[in-house]
Amino acid sequence: AVYELQKIIGTALFPVFDGGKTSDWSNTTYILMDIAMIILFIPAYILLFRPERGSERIRLRDTGGMGLLCTAAGAVITSVAIGLAIKLAAIWGAFPVFDNVEIILKDGNLLLSVLSIVICAPLMEELVFRGLVFKSFRSVSGFWFSAILSSAVWAVIHLNLVQGIRAVGVGLFLAFVYETYQKLWVPVFAHMSINAVATASDYSGVLKGLHIGTFWYIIIIVLMLAALYPICRGIAKTGTRL
C-alpha cells in the first residue's frame, strides 16, 4: 500500500523525481519518498493524539520476550495462511497470483530493496493505517468496527484485489496487536517480520518450484489458522488491553 500512497502523493508533490513518472521510479526514489512521508505523517500523529513524552519508546518490557515472539509468529502465520489461500484460489482459477515483493526485488539493488521493503514500508504503513486511521476510528467507536474499517481502507489503497484480501486479514491482526499493547512500534515490528520473511523467501528461492496438492494446501491453511488461537491468547495475556 505504501507504494500506491507514494505514487499518489509523490506525483503531486515531487514531480521532479525521475521525471515525475512513477513507473520509472528507482528504489532510491521510493526510499526518499518513504522518508518524506514519514516526516509528513509523524507531526500529524503527534498533533492528533498528543502522545505523552516517552510513551512510544521501544522497550522489550512492553511486550516481554514471549509476547514479541508471539506477535512476530502470528503476523507471519496470518500472512502466509492468507497467501496460501490465495494461491489455492488461483489454482482453482479464481484470480492470478500477484507477488509485489518479488517484483520490487527484481527491480533494483538488493540492499536498497530490502531497506525499502523491510524497514521503510512497514514503518510508513503502520504509522498511517494503525497510528492514524485505526486510532482515529478507535477514538469514536469500538475495536472491531475500527479494526475492520481501517483494514478495509488499507486494502482499498492497495488498488489490487489479491493484495487487498491479504491486507484485510493482516490488518485485523496488526490492529489486534496495537490494541493489546498500545505501542505503535509493536505492529511495526510485526509488519517488518512479515516483509523480512517474504523477502528472504523470494530472494533465496527456497519455495520456488515447490508443488503440493490441493488437499495439502487446505491442511496447512487449517493448521496455521488453528495455531493462531493460542498465539493470540499469548499476546492477550502479555498485553495491557483486551
Describe the function of each predicted region.
Residues 5-12, 151, 162-219:
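Functionally important transmembrane alpha-helices
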Residues 17-27, 53-121, 139:
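Juxtamembrane helix-loop-helix connectors linking adjacent transmembrane helices
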Residues 1-49, 218:
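Alpha-helical transmembrane segments in multi-pass membrane proteins
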Residues 214-230:
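Small-residue-rich transmembrane alpha-helices that serve as helix-helix interface/gating elements
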Residues 143-158, 192:
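Small-polar-interrupted transmembrane alpha-helices in polytopic inner-membrane proteins
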Residues 124-149, 176-183:
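Membrane-interface helix/loop boundary segments of multi-pass membrane proteins
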Residues 31-32, 68-73, 111-115, 144-149, ...:
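Hydrophobic alpha-helical transmembrane segments
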Residues 49-54, 229-242:
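Membrane-interface capping segments at transmembrane-helix boundaries
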